[in-house]
Amino acid sequence: MSGGGNNVVNKVFYATSYHPIQAGSIDGTDVAPHDNGVRRALLCYNAGLYDPSGDSKAVGDPYCTLFVGRLSHHTTEDTLREVMSKYGRIKNLRLVRHIVTGASRGYGFVEYETEKEMLRAYEDAHHSLIDGREIIVDYNRQQLMPGWIPRRLGGGLGGRKESGQLRFGGRDRPFRAPLRPIPHEDLKKLGIQLPPEGRYMSRTQIPSPPRRKGSVSDREEEYYREKSSVEREEEFKERSSLRSYHSHRSSAHTHSSHRRRSKDREECSREESRSDRKERARGMEDRYGDNKGEVSGSKRSKRSEEDRSRKRHKHLPSHHHRRSYSQDHHSSD
């Protein structure tokens, strides 16, 4: 592949397996070692002199472990733990020290309780500051990257320009998209990973670390990470639009439900009011009916007593009549 321009320069790719010659090449297309360090690493690589499982101190789950580099030599285990615990629960932490002097070697390993916590630190802690030094964070390549050769044997990744032994393909220094034709056959003979023509990543994308096989969520996450920033933005807008649509429908449904419940309560209240009014009316009729009966009965009783009184007075002689009768009786005597 050939190309040019800024668009090509800004396109990168990352190594998924380690090869010393490729690691020494800025675009991953070298077919011969260009410095003594690469030659030494190639010798170890071909002879199988490095065994990543031979480090007795490399314990723990590699899928939950991060490499932390470029630490200050004054940074302690406590300081490293305090900073890295912001991203999750730390299960184990090891600051690598010189076997004789005990001085810090400037790097360490942090194991988290879960892969999710490790990923959070992998994404957020990279290029953060600890004791005034900008650190680098990467996955545990020692145990997870096929063919890995460490820095002390001429391999590794990254490095500083002043050292004269830069290594490419890692998170800090990815391979650039080649500006020259790719020697496909030569690379295949050496067993070197070919550049992913047409599938380069941008520098703003974060390369995904190795994940356990068989996880659907891992495949989805890798697919998402490999998308361009434009595709991710479009997908984000689409998901946001769908969430907004469903939220609007849910809100409308909730509002409609509230209105129906409110209407039902109003109708129920009206029914209860009508029922209450009828009950009160019947109660008042009953009470007034009883009072009317009592009043009517009282009136009838009074009229009956008056009638009886008149009848008695009618049958009894009057006082004047009695006196006349008495006088007449005495006169006759």
UniProtKB/Swiss-Prot annotation:
Subcellular location: Nucleus speckle
Domain RRM: 64-142
Tissue/organ expression: Ubiquitous.
Keywords: mRNA processing, mRNA splicing, Nucleus, Phosphoprotein, Ribonucleoprotein, Spliceosome
Post-translational modifications: Phosphorylated.
Stretches with biased composition (Basic residues): 245-262, 310-324
SUPFAM superfamilies tied to this protein: RNA-binding domain, RBD (SSF54928)
GO molecular function: RNA binding
Biased amino acid composition, Basic and acidic residues: 159-175, 215-241, 263-293
Annotated region described as Disordered, given as residue ranges: 154-333
One Gene Ontology cellular component: U11/U12 snRNP
Stored InterPro entries: Nucleotide-bd_a/b_plait_sf (IPR012677), RBD_domain_sf (IPR035979), RRM_dom (IPR000504), snRNP35_RRM (IPR034146), U1_U11-U12_snRNP_70-35kDa (IPR051183)
Source superkingdom: Eukaryota
Entry-linked Gene3D superfamilies: 3.30.70.330
Subunit text: Part of the U11 snRNP, a component of the minor U12-type spliceosome. U11 and U12 snRNPs exist not only as monoparticles but also as a preformed U11/U12 di-snRNP complex. Interacts with CYP95, SCL28, SCL30, SCL30A, SCL33, SC35, SR30, SR34, RS31, RS40, RSZ21 and RS2Z33.
Its biological purpose: May facilitate 5' splice site recognition in the minor spliceosome. May be involved in interactions with components of the major spliceosome bound to the pyrimidine tract of an upstream U2-type intron.
Protein name: U11/U12 small nuclear ribonucleoprotein 35 kDa protein
Organism expressing this protein natively: Arabidopsis thaliana (Mouse-ear cress)
